[in-house]
């Protein structure tokens, strides 16, 4: 394993192209300076990270809600806006208002949805498209077959990391949001390298985190890599508040 810093090693061999992207990300280079192949790969990483993080969060919610059948408890984290989108999704597959009002009809609808996984996946894709997600989001079988799936999905959509990934996907290629997309994409890409095993954190990282007030792990890793590789960041003070950032707070959420 190659040493990449005091706290980081290269666990899985990175290709020259992957290393080049990592160095550009660490420098904070403008996305406009990336080659088209690099941009396509970065966009793919964001799409895959959106799917991965969403499924991990849904799995967490499904474990928390195991055995729970109380609708008020299950819906405690689901924003009203999500219920409206779910209502529109139901209407798109031919569900009538009378079916949603009557208890017996709702029960039959629930059984019908949970016995037709393709229908649930289609409803999910409708919800994602309404939120501005254009790629096909694959829900893991263990998540979509959970009886509380729609509650679990609605609960995790306001999570901050999900919204940051959503921000990058919606505003990808938009000049006004480029600085923030670049900033968020850099963090997401480093997280991707950790999750895929390309980067391995050493035990000394924990000691460093404790001595620096437990600042973000990606900040420590990024600073360590930049220091070891002699990389100077290009990011200056171009991170200013823009109206588009309101997307991160549309659900008035406190979940992470």
Curated annotation (Swiss-Prot):
* InterPro entries on file: Herpes_UL79 (IPR004290)
The UniProt family comment states:
Belongs to the herpesviridae UL79 family.
* Source species, domain of life: Viruses
Protein name listed in UniProt: Gene 18 protein
UniProt gene name:
18
